[in-house]
């Protein structure tokens, strides 16, 4: 399962059967009763051709109803979002020519129905105590909550370590910006770290989707660790992209499609930023526009930040400018000019104190 398909599967499918949902409660009841079961979500044209027998219900879904109906041998068909029970005790006759790697009759039928219809099919094993999801050509066995929680907590610890390193790299980059010593190597290094941190965040979100109501604490820890990271990276892209009118969200989306190995090559990051001419990243100086640092000044609207960036070439030009020069920028009065001047000095002082020497 590639990362994009896996993310979509976790977001759309695993959420439906996550702990805390009515559907998962019903499935767990069937699992504990050891009756086994076959549940299909969706009754489209493809389904009509393979359903045989059973009886039509069209009643609201409830865990208790699912539990009782699973005592019968046939499959249960729900509507697409699992809020209604449409049919019960039906026999499913998918095309036998469709390949299946499963051995048990129930699981083999489930896999073929999923491949033939594209619907979500849930197979509850009678003997093995396993819940298996089939969706199109995808197969996924639901794991024990304890196992997922352990993996999620390990991922949070890993994220915490990577985020600490990233925070220090961003601080060091800020200090170098004020010293006008930034090269594209430092920019690439920060982008690589951001990519790794966002990948770990994506993994944790997949766990959260599968954990459902059991994942609240994991979600809180995740938000605490990476709440402003996307904003930080978008501003970083605006600072260092070749063209000022680049769409930073598009650059970020392209970056997240790259593998860690691809981004270890600095030239790939430079291409994402719009630089196609090869140069020595260790020596080539990079001048930030100032979006990221200016956004750290409280009560400074985005329009004012844009006006400042267009009026001055970089942060240091703003820092060196006197109050009169700042006042001349559109939308900046005397009070705001003083706010900007004091804010930049304070940020510079803090960065120099926190940098890794």
Swiss-Prot record:
Its recorded reaction(s) are: 2 ATP = 3',3'-c-di-AMP + 2 diphosphate
> By its UniProt entry, which Pfam families does this protein fall under?
DAC, DisA-linker
This protein's cofactor list reads: Mg(2+)
A GO molecular function held by the record: adenylate cyclase activity
- PANTHER family linked: DIADENYLATE CYCLASE, DNA INTEGRITY SCANNING PROTEIN DISA
Q: How does it assemble?
A: Homooctamer.
- Name used for this protein in its record: DNA integrity scanning protein DisA
Question: Which species expresses this protein natively?
Answer: Halalkalibacterium halodurans (strain ATCC BAA-125 / DSM 18197 / FERM 7344 / JCM 9153 / C-125)
């Amino acid at each position: 399962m590639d990362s994009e398909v896996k993310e979509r599967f976790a977001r759309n499918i695993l959420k439906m059967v996550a702990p805390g949902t009515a559907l998962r409660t019903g499935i767990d009841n069937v699992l504990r009763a050891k009756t086994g079961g076959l549940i299909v979500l969706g009754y489209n044209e493809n389904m009509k051709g393979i359903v045989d027998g059973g009886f039509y219900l069209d009643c609201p879904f409830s865990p208790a109803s699912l539990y009782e109906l699973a005592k019968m041998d046939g499959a249960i068909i729900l509507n697409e979002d699992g809020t209604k029970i449409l049919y019960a005790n039906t026999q499913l006759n998918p095309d036998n020519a469709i390949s299946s790697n499963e051995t048990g009759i129930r699981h083999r039928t489930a896999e073929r129905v999923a491949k033939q219809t594209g619907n979500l099919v849930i197979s509850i094993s009678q003997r093995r105590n396993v819940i298996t999801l089939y969706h199109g050509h995808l197969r996924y066995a639901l794991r024990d909550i304890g196992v997922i929680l352990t993996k999620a907590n390990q991922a949070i610890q890993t994220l915490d370590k990577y985020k600490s390193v990233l925070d220090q790299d961003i601080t060091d980059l800020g200090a170098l910006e004020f010293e006008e010593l930034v090269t594209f190597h430092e920019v690439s290094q920060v982008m690589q770290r951001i990519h790794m941190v966002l990948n770990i965040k994506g993994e944790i979100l997949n766990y959260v989707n599968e954990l459902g109501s059991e994942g609240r604490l994991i979600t809180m820890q995740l938000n605490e660790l990476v709440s402003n990271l996307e904003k930080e990276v978008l501003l970083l892209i605006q600072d260092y992209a070749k063209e000022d009118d680049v769409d930073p969200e598009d650059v970020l989306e392209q970056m997240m499609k790259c593998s860690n190995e691809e981004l270890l090559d600095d030239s790939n990051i430079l291409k994402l930023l719009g630089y196609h001419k090869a140069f020595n990243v260790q020596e080539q100086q990079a001048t930030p526009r100032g979006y990221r640092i200016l956004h750290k000044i409280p009560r400074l609207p985005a329009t004012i930040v844009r006006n400042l960036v267009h009026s001055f070439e970089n942060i240091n030009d703003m820092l060196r400018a006197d109050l009169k020069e700042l006042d001349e920028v559109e939308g900046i009065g005397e009070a705001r000019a003083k706010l900007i001047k004091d804010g930049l000095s304070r940020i510079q002082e803090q960065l120099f104190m926190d940098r890794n020497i």
